Amino acid sequence: MRFLRVTILALTLLAPATALAAGDDTKPYDDKLLRLSEILGAVHFLRELCGAEEGQLWRQQMAALVEAESASTARRVRFINSFNKGYRSYRRTYQSCTTAAQAQVTRFLTEGAELAKALAEPKP
């Protein structure tokens, strides 16, 4: 849950900055957002596989990220492709919930929280 709060905070703080630079398609922080998108996709698959019964929670977080970014069509597609890449790569790797899958979720939640925190930090 901490990851979700940090992610939502990061997205809220990024929205005004994005609105100012709406004419530019690529943002300096897009690499981090693309990685976060990939993590959200992987976590969506793995948590569902491991019976978390969260429904579409992680997909909704991805939709919130894209919405908060007010992304152009090209950026939106890149974010969605990253989400799908994360989802598909772990769908190919895991057919059942294993200890390794659960450990990967923990690693992803940690990395995602770190990315969200870095994205939320004001830049000088």
Task: Please place each PLM-identified region on the residue numbering.
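Immediate post-signal-peptide N-terminus of mature secreted/exported proteins
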Residues: 21-52
